[in-house]
């Protein structure tokens, strides 16, 4: 097995809740209005320190997408998915972007998943 290179991000970061490996900075959040099986999920423009799994077609609330699960490069935990292809024109903005499930990551202040019932969950995209 090769040497593992992990990128340490500066500033306010989201990290793995199991091993604290950095994934993304708050400035790369596109939307906090998504949700998944475990609750809230955030859409990010850039994510680091993940491996990308096999591409697969999934029917989600917003239609058909080709996605690939993403895993923490350090501990192997499933932490979200990457949008490869969005088949609906209105969903094309998601292509090449990443979902991090809040249940599986620590927030920028070390906090875990928090369920705020007052925030609307529009534009969500879990499987139907």
From Swiss-Prot:
One of its GO terms (molecular function) is metal ion binding. Pfam families: Yippee-Mis18. This is Protein yippee-like At3g08990. It comes from Arabidopsis thaliana (Mouse-ear cress). PROSITE patterns: YIPPEE (PS51792). Keywords: Metal-binding, Zinc. It comes from the Eukaryota. Zn(2+) binds at residues 16, 19, 72, 75. Residues 12-109 form the Yippee domain. Belongs to the yippee family.
């Amino acid at each position: 097995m090769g040497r593992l290179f992990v990128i340490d991000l500066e500033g306010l970061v989201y990290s793995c809740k199991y091993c604290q490996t950095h994934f993304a900075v708050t400035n790369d959040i596109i939307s906090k209005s998504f949700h998944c099986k475990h609750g809230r999920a955030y859409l990010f423009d850039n994510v680091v320190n993940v491996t990308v799994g096999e591409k697969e077609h999934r029917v989600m609330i917003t239609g058909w997408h080709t996605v690939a699960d993403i895993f923490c490069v350090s501990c192997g935990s499933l932490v979200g998915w990457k949008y490869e292809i969005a088949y609906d024109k209105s969903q094309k903005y998601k292509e090449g972007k990443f979902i991090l499930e809040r249940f599986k990551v620590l927030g920028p202040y070390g906090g875990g998943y928090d369920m705020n019932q007052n925030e609307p969950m529009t534009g969500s995209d879990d499987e139907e």
